[in-house]
Amino acid sequence: MIDANAVTAVVVTYNRLALLQQCLAALCAQTVRGFTVLVVDNASTDGTADYLKTLDMPGLVCRNPGKNLGGAGGFAYGIREAAALGCKAVWI
């Protein structure tokens, strides 16, 4: 069994702030604690970056690649970032 501290949930978003808020709320409601949530903001223009800065969520890591990489590109970017953080398993 993998320790929750070695798990990263990768969430990719682009101009879907309301859906991102729902997704993060669901992740916060998990009974397992200690995992990392890595949000890849694909250069959103809807206030997503500002919203993410206001959060006080343990384990939250935010990345903005500076351009919209698309869904698959965003997940590939997020998985690379998660590996750089030392995670052993990724939720996508």
Model-derived segments and spans:
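Cell-envelope/extracellular polymer assembly enzymes that use nucleotide-activated donors
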Residues: 6-8, 36
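Active-site beta-to-alpha loop of glycosyltransferases that engages the nucleotide-sugar donor
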Residues: 11-22, 43
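Residue-level preference for short helical/loop micro-motifs built around acidic side chains
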Residues: 18-21, 46, 50, 73
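Short, acidic, metal-binding catalytic loop of nucleotide-sugar glycosyltransferases
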Residues: 25-34
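A conserved acidic beta->alpha catalytic loop
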Residues: 26, 41-50
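Short beta-strand/loop segment that forms part of the nucleotide-sugar
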Residues: 35-43, 63-65
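Glycine-rich, basic loop-to-helix element that forms the pyrophosphate-binding segment
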Residues: 65-85
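Short beta-strand-to-loop acidic/aromatic patch adjacent to the donor-nucleotide binding site
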Residues: 86-92
